[in-house]
Amino acid sequence: PYTPSTPSTPSAPGLDKTKTDSAAAINAAATANKYDAAEQAEVKKILDKANADIKNAKTEAEVKAIEEAAQAEIDKILTTEEKAIVAALDNVEKRDFETKSKVITRKGGKKVIRLTWTAPDGVDVDGYEIFRSTKKNSGFGKKPYFTTSNTSYTNTKDLKAGKTYYYKVRAFVVINGERVYTDYSMKAFRTIK
């Protein structure tokens, strides 16, 4: 009599290819940056764990998740050059990064507040965040009032006669997609009369 055979589970060529591709992608990401010996040791730990996890993965989705997690961890490791940038930002002090302000009367009598500052020494910044408040020591909020790549800003909106406006500025550099900030500048303030 005919006995149907139990179908064998075929090996998943798609999964094998995904494993190979993911391992290659992680290794490529690790060698793309210029890491020193200590940083390379950190990267090697991540790679060894990821490669072991990929071998044991059961699905393509699992492999992709391992690859993405490993790449994210590798991206967090700062190179010597990036560490130097962070150190330079940390060394920018308020007195080195002063914000000046003045009230300007435009044609038609409208008054605006013009802010200017000097780029911090030793740092190639990507931009500046300006914070504004009507209180001297609070009310600046966590979100910047304005962001610019220039070393000046003219506040033309939401200005009322008799009010004093306080401003502080901080510079930032983008490293691995994240903003790293200097300390805030000394506050500048002006009263609209």
Model-derived segments and spans:
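Solvent-exposed strand-loop boundary residues in beta-sheet-rich modules
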Residues: 121, 134-138, 175-177
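Ser/Thr- and Asn-enriched, surface-exposed coil loops between beta-strands
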Residues: 59, 107-111, 147-153
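Pro/Thr/Ser/Gly-rich low-complexity, intrinsically disordered linker/stalk tracts
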Residues: 84-122, 179-193
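Recognizes extended acidic, P/S/T-rich segments that occur
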Residues: 129-161
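Beta-rich interaction/scaffold domains
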Residues: 1-88
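Beta-strand-rich modules
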Residues: 158-176
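Solvent-exposed loop segments of extracellular immunoglobulin-like
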Residues: 124-126
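An aromatic-rich alpha-helical recognition segment common to small helix-rich domains
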Residues: 117, 130, 155, 167-169
